[in-house]
């Protein structure tokens, strides 16, 4: 979506002001600052509708309520629908060194009372009285900023109306976070990536790219088609080359004819016609499906602050599932030591290029790592110029333990010197969980000693709790002293939920 000149100019002015006040906002815990959290997934609506309970993904940024541990900070949180009071209380009770009462006085919750699939930011903009109420709570705009899932023209417009900057990237640079833009960056930096073609516009472009890939590699069995703005794998599709000969004089026609039947679309319920309409609207890429007996999908999370400083803040091994292995299910933290340090080299190269182009905020870089002949080979897959599925788990860990990730050792260390690990998932889903209210979940977790224990600094944190009763879906961050302990917390929680819901169905 192109950014209108007036909006862009105002947005850039606010971002410059942000840099001037950055030190006071982020390094003075007693500064009277305001953080406006707008957890809007401003993405393609068709893509969003394929995700079960997508509206409750707005709850993933409730981890930022931990900012209330700073006693002079005000947090304004806006959502499409009201968030149950028990969910808010659940987060506030974790605040270290702050009473729930004190925090509650500085927390302001707003709802649009709108359950449509429109962007939350659009819902806010459509309610000028709501915008006025939010603006009235921002006492010092120079010490305030907005946090979003991703930044588009809508978020830039809201930023201007609230007179506060966004800790995020100028939407004019959004192409850099698309599938095509990512490959452009990788190509310019000579970062290894799968063979493929970007900036494709339609079905014919897909056909031609599939033909060229097969001709370049006659042994290729599969290729991946990706819509530029897809997320969590739901914009992806797999093409199978079975029975197609790279030397055939009619290869292009054969692929064109077989494409509707051979293309396995990842998104639930999305047919071929809708997928191609989405591709034509947003563009995309085609690349080889990389084979390997041992494959991992690590990601590196980077941050560029308003002063232009680049940091690697975490690494994860992503857990991908679905029939095609393309759907993001969760992640383990930190990534394997065997290659986490190796990933720092291409990641910092990419982050440096992004910084030069004016990128601000957090973003993730996904890789595919293949083990061959006794070594790991890493291929850059995409840049996620937004908060992703690994953002909120890591923020939660940091808020709870006050530690830091050390890229050199590949470990996360708390102030007491101990290490922590976690397994996180946004896709814990079972029809048996439908009917469980937030109160039920928290009660079950307390009775079975699953909740995060501040003394041990281990346990389970839940998120997306609001999706549980209607969709049987929720998220978890399971923190332990080892990868094995973190995974054990996850398995125990699943077993408890399964048992409780079997013993008392529809509870």
Predicted segment positions?
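Short, flexible loop/turn elements at secondary-structure junctions
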Residues: 150-151, 200, 229-231, 288-291, ...
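Active-site nucleotide/adenylate-binding loops and adjacent lid/helix of ATP-dependent enzymes
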Residues: 172-283, 333-345
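Peripheral (often C-terminal) accessory segments that flank ATP-dependent C-N-forming ligase machineries
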Residues: 402-507
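Short acidic, glycine/serine/threonine-rich loops at helix termini
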Residues: 49, 89, 158-161, 234-241, ...
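Glycine-rich phosphate/pyrophosphate-binding beta-alpha loops
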Residues: 321, 380-394
């Amino acid at each position: 979506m192109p950014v209108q000149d007036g909006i862009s100019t105002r947005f850039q002015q606010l971002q410059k002001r942000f840099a001037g006040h950055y030190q006071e906002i982020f390094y003075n815990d007693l500064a009277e600052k305001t953080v406006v959290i707008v957890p809007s997934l401003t993405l393609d609506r068709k893509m969003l509708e394929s995700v079960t309970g997508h509206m409750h993904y707005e709850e993933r940024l409730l981890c930022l309520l931990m900012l209330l541990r700073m006693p002079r900070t005000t947090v304004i949180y806006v959502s499409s629908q009201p968030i149950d009071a028990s969910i808010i209380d659940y987060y506030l009770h974790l605040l270290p060194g702050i009473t729930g009462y004190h925090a509650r006085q500085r927390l302001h919750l707003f709802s649009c009372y709108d359950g449509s699939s429109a962007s939350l930011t659009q819902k806010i903009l459509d309610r000028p009285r709501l915008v006025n109420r939010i603006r009235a709570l921002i006492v010092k705009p120079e010490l305030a900023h907005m946090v979003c899932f991703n930044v588009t023209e809508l978020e830039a417009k809201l930023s201007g109306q609230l007179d506060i900057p966004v800790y995020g990237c100028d939407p004019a640079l959004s192409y850099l976070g698309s599938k095509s833009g990512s490959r452009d960056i990788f190509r310019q930096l000579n970062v290894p990536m799968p063979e493929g073609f970007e900036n494709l516009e339609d079905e014919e472009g897909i056909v031609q790219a599939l033909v060229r890939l097969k001709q370049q590699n006659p042994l290729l069995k599969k290729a991946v088609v990706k819509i530029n703005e897809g997320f969590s794998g739901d914009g992806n599709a797999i093409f199978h080359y079975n029975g197609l000969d790279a030397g055939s004089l009619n290869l292009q026609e054969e692929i064109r004819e077989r494409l509707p039947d051979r293309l396995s679309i990842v998104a639930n319920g999305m047919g071929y016609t809708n997928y191609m309409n989405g591709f034509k609207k947003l563009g995309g890429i085609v690349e080889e499906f990389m084979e390997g007996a041992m494959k991992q999908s690590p990601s590196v999370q980077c941050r560029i602050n308003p002063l232009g400083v680049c940091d690697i803040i975490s690494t994860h091994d992503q857990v991908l599932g679905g029939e095609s292995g393309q759907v993001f299910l969760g992640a383990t933290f930190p990534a394997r030591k065997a290659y986490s340090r190796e990933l720092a080299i291409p990641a910092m190269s990419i982050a440096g290029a992004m910084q030069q182009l004016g990128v601000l905020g957090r973003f993730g870089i996904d890789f595919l790592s293949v083990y061959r002949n006794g070594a790991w080979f890493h291929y850059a897959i995409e840049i996620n110029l937004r908060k992703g599925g690994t953002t909120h788990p890591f923020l939660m860990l940091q808020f709870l333990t006050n530690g830091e990730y050390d890229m050199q050792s590949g470990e996360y260390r708390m102030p007491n010197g101990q290490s922590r690990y976690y397994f996180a998932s946004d896709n814990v889903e079972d029809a048996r969980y439908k009917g469980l209210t937030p109160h039920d979940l928290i009660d079950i977790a307390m009775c079975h000693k699953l909740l995060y224990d501040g003394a041990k600094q281990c346990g389970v944190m839940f998120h997306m709790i609001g999706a549980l009763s209607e969709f049987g879906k929720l998220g978890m961050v399971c923190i332990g002293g080892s990868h094995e302990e973190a995974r054990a917390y996850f398995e125990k929680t699943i077993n408890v939920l399964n048992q409780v819901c079997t013993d008392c169905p529809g509870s």
